[in-house]
């Protein structure tokens, strides 16, 4: 897990934002990219550069590939309503996103790991696919045998993050109920994700 956290710190510094809101993230003090020439600071970005950077924020925040992110956008674009709201709604309905934002695990990476190791159920059925889309009313739960895994115990003891209004979490039962699809303003991002720039990036 230490390796994962270190990698996350490098990502945050490369993007110039504290992407996951960690208090110890070096980007809080060092506002420049990592590496030998990082101290020179960030280059001024073109409009495309800004759009590309916004796309990378979402890619790293949700720990998904560029291909997955593009598929998500196309799905959002083809739905009725505002593309940006649809985009956020789909990302937040991913099983890994729900588990992470519930506060039952400390990171998106630990959420994905628990899911892939079959430690998570949806409506009492084991689901081992992080991209599985939950529906309003679904109950996600960490299996009893996984309740003593260090990352789960850590999250329960620290309770650093409160579940947003569209989730109903129960730390004692290690469960969370997905109530509804959220809007961008409701998602507890610790940085400005600039979703409109992502829409522009994929709409070129």
UniProtKB/Swiss-Prot annotation:
Residues covered by the S4 RNA-binding domain: 93-156
Listed GO biological process terms: ribosomal small subunit biogenesis; translation
Keyword DNA repair carried by entry: no
PROSITE patterns in alphabetical order: S4 (PS50889)
Keyword rRNA-binding: yes
A single GO cellular-component term on record: small ribosomal subunit
Pfam family, one: Ribosomal_S4
Top-rank lineage group of the source organism: Bacteria
InterPro entries in UniProt: Ribosomal_uS4, Ribosomal_uS4_bac-type, Ribosomal_uS4_N, S4_RNA-bd, S4_RNA-bd_sf
Keywords: Ribonucleoprotein, Ribosomal protein, RNA-binding, rRNA-binding
MF annotations from Gene Ontology: rRNA binding; structural constituent of ribosome
SMART domains named in the record: Ribosomal_S4, S4
Known role: One of the primary rRNA binding proteins, it binds directly to 16S rRNA where it nucleates assembly of the body of the 30S subunit. With S5 and S12 plays an important role in translational accuracy.
Assembly: Part of the 30S ribosomal subunit. Contacts protein S5. The interaction surface between S4 and S5 is involved in control of translational fidelity.
Listed PANTHER family: 30S 40S RIBOSOMAL PROTEIN (PTHR11831), SMALL RIBOSOMAL SUBUNIT PROTEIN US4M (PTHR11831:SF4)
UniProt record similarity statement: Belongs to the universal ribosomal protein uS4 family.
Protein name: Small ribosomal subunit protein uS4
Organism whose genome encodes this protein: Wolbachia sp. subsp. Drosophila simulans (strain wRi)
